[in-house]
Amino acid sequence: IPADNYPCATDYITQMKDMIQILLEKGKAYKHDDGSIYFKISSFQDYGKLSNIKTNNKKPNSRIISDEYDKNNVQDFVLWKAWKVDDGDIYWDSPWGKGRPGWHIECSAMSKATLGSHFDIHCGGVDNIFPHHENEIAQSKCANGKNFVNYWLHSEFLMLNDTKMSKSLGNYYTIQDLKKMNFSSESI
């Protein structure tokens, strides 16, 4: 069944910047000296519910360098990465300076634009539960002021010889490969 929409992240940069601005205005995010914008995890009391993690085991106000960007707290995550010379021409102008959106804000902005600020089912692999889906919940709920998703469905990895099947590892089979190995259509 073909999808109704095939969203491309770069088509939603304006919506991403708008969502970041809302989070800044609500005090859920902050701007670092270099122009990067971070989500303040401590501002969202339900953080960790999906993944069942506790955020109080990290040292508050510790400073680290993550993905080459400073932040005020080890738990905070990037919403907007300030441009650096090494980024070349990969940037967009924003009220905070040149930069690019973080991975998590891309998904929140695209889903809001295509599905609305609240929808029923969100799917992904188990490797997306933390931090990606946890961060999507935090920023979406804080920006929109309501529940983001009713049901989360996460698929497990396909295993092949006790190793995760992965294109990057080259240990995968296509449907055609499985048919040649006499697997039935029902089992595929």
Model-flagged regions — what are they?
Residues 14-188:
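Alpha-helical recognition segments enriched in aromatics with Gly/Pro capping
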